[in-house]
């Protein structure tokens, strides 16, 4: 264990660093940026939270004695009435949720088509471009539907895109340099969305409540059994949240173009939320934490 007492570490970069169990006393974190940070079971006392923006997976967050997580969920459901339908309880609910996502994504794609094609490869505020977002959703479907539910040991298309921090895994593509056209990605997306539709339509209630069979091959997710319901909920969440991010960033790109300011700030996009990790983590109930889950609108 190393002690830093009176140290000047301003501007330091900590990446893939284990600081679990650390004690921070009278520490200046003003202006700090935390991304993909696990703050599970962190206790803060006597802190000053002024002009702070937090986007992430929030559960059991108590601020000044008040659990604010239910309040946040309720407000997001109020802003987006269809959001609550992304937590279906039965097969019919999953079908309705997928209907909603198909409709919403059709509108988002129409909006993207109104921009110059080159802007669809642009990053806004270090997030994935629109094309990269579509590639990531292909990867999500391949991983959780084609591999986990349908049992294909190697379902990935070369254009699929895992999250940036995912460890290299045999057979899993991660080509960040390829620049496919929108039409090429949409053809792939139509195929994957049709696959999800087929799975949902063919499910019985018993199958929905069942578990997948482990796929005995390296890949993602890791080889083990998963609740079928959990696999589909991950896909619904990915589709819902990433569309909101895409809408936000398309609006920024369009505004910058209209204002004649050129492209938005390009940078390598990556998304890592509190449930997005290169390694699976155990929930208190013993199940495996979904390896990624997009966070509420505002970050990826």
Briefly describe each language-model feature range:
Residues 1-75:
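Tandem repeat scaffolds
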Residues 93-111, 169-209, 230-235:
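Acidic/histidine-rich alpha-helical segments that form the ligand environment
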Residues 55-110:
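Active-site-adjacent scaffolding segments
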Residues 117-171, 194, 211-266, 270, ...:
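Short, contiguous alpha-helical
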Residues 278-281, 298:
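Single-residue "anchor" positions within short linear motifs
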Residues 274, 287, 296-298:
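N-terminal polybasic/positive-inside topogenic patches
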Residues 272-278:
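Leucine-biased recognition of intrinsically disordered, low-complexity hydrophobic segments
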